Each structure stands twice: as structure tokens, then as C-alpha cells.
Amino acid sequence: MAETMRALRKLEAGPGATLQEVPIPTIGPRDVLVKVRAASICGTDYHIYTWDPWSAGRVKPPLTIGHELAGEVVAVGREVTACKVGDYVSAETHIVCNRCPRCHMGEYHLCENTKILGVDTDGAFAEYVAVPEQNIWVNDKDIPFELQSIQEPLGNAVHTALNGDLTARSVLITGCGPIGIMSVPVAKMAGAEIVMAMDINEYRLQLAGQLGADVLINPTKQDPVEVVRSYTRGYGADVVLEMSGNPTAIRQGLKAARNGARISLLGLPGRPLELDLAADVIMRGLVLQGITGRRMWQTWYQVRSLYRAGLAERLRPLVTHRMPLEQIDAAMELMGSGQSGKIVLVPDLKA
């Protein structure tokens, strides 16, 4: 094995990322060295690349970015037993402390001291990445690497959608970014009676339709509340999966929900949000759920079962672009345009 590798690095505060030749990571006794075969771009990566206020307050350069990964194990620490050389793996990117009360209660996704791969530690937009053994997930080898790499964000969709019963329910998904779009086939496979997808981006709406959405709603052209009620016998949606973080979409989702509906909130608003809690939530008996990350490891087992039941094949259209590390600027520009599904970086792909 060579001693160096190519990696996309955030070298200093400010926009952009630099492709550098750096040493291949060394691993400790409980670490795993993974040769990265595919790494999909997440909204978090875009925030770090563009260097928004959140990134400026959280990320400490220099740092190799990227966290949604799939690859092959090429070396393991002497105490590692969870995987072996040659295994195909992905990673749970939340590195938890195992010491706080939430970890002690088995709520690892709510760890008080979480560190994130590619945000707080060197990440996966590189030819190799070192991952703690406790974060390794061994994949079925018949799943393409690009679909293995999107399991982490898919876990967010699964956690949000399956945090309550969907059987025979009407479901409204507000926000058709990749996670919102992933929620469409998840809800369908979970037995939803009808799945309605809402976004102002026509490209993303059509992609949601390709993945199985029954109704596509563009709130700039239609009244979403009226549309939802027209498909739900005038009552409103049984379940709202809020994936956008957009204040207007959140309010529309609440108004489009039936009395007593479940509202699962994953999208992060960029500013404080004003709601009429009395009229829109309390008096209507809505059940609001804040969703963060994936349950460790319950959600990963759910994803595996769904993949084996056919979800992997259904998600193929979501991966719209495959690009080499050298094209990170073009990849981020494309992501910012909103005219893509999931963009996957492939280190072995030639520019």
C-alpha cells in the first residue's frame, strides 16, 4: 500500500476545498482503515464547502471533509472483531462517547458529546478513511457502492418515517431534498395509502414522482392545504414528514394535517420560527416529534431489511451524478443549483 493518498481538505476558514496529497491515516487497535469506493455529498458538506455561519462556528481546519461513505476494509486494528479485511462497509458517522446518560440509556443518537466524521474528525472525501470499529457497518456485497454510501442519510429518512405507524395512512412529505425523496419509497414500503410530496423545485418534485410519490405539490402553483384535503376526504394528512426546515413549508404542513396527526420534524430552520401553537397544534391535538440522526443501531437494521426487500433498487434513480474528487467545485455548484439528486464522489473515477 502507498504511504499517501488524495484527500479533499478544508485548509482554512472560507469557501472551497483543496485536493491534497496527504499521509494515509494510521489506525489504532480499535480502528478500521477503509478504502473509499464511493462518498455521497450531504447538505452538511455543502455548508462546510461554502463556509456558512454554522461551519465557521463548528469546523476547525485543516480537515478532510465528507462523511457518507462506502468502501472496502483494507486493514484492521489488533483488537477489531466486528469486521475483517475485504468486507464492504459503511459508517455510522456520529461518534458517541459511551459515557453520558443518553448513551448509558441506549439512546446513542442523542449522545451529549457526539463528534461527527468529516466535521470534527478527518472524513471520507479521500481515497482512505480511518473509522472507529464501533461505527462500522458491514454491507451486503451485492449492493452497489453508491447505494451503500447513501445509507447514512437514508437512515434519517427511515427514522423520520418509521417513528410511527404508516400502514393505511395518508402521508405528506414537505421538502424534496434527497432525504425527503428517500422518504417516498420508505413510506410506500411501510404501507402508506397515499404519499404526497411538496416542494417548489420542479426537478426535485419530478424525482420524487419517479420514486413513487402519488401526488406532487408545488406550493407556488397550488394551495397545498386544498390539494392535501382533496386527497384525504377533506380531513388532511395523517402523517406529515417535515424535511425542509422552511418556515413557510412547516406552517403549510401543520395546516394540511388532520386533527391528531403525527408531525415528524427533521428539517432544520435557519432562524427562529413563529407558530400559533394554540390554534395550529394544541387545540388540534397534533403530535410533534423532533427527529435527529438515526437510532444506533436499530435504524441501520431497518435500512438493511428494506434494502433486501427491494428499496435499494427503488433508490437507483436518486443517484443522478457520479464525479471524481478533482471535480469537487463542479459537484458543489451542481448541488447548489438544486438540479440534481444525490451526487456521489468516486475516488477511483478519472477526471
Curated annotation (Swiss-Prot):
Residue stretches spanning the membrane: none
Taxonomy of the source species: Bacteria, Bacillati, Bacillota, Clostridia, Eubacteriales
GO MF annotation, one: zinc ion binding
Gene that encodes it: tdh
Pfam families found in the cross-reference section: ADH_N, ADH_zinc_N
Biological process according to GO: L-threonine catabolic process to glycine
Name of protein: L-threonine 3-dehydrogenase
Site (Important for catalytic activity for the proton relay mechanism but does not participate directly in the coordination of zinc atom) location in chain: 152
Organism: Symbiobacterium thermophilum (strain DSM 24528 / JCM 14929 / IAM 14863 / T)
Localization in the cell: Cytoplasm
EC numbers on record: 1.1.1.103
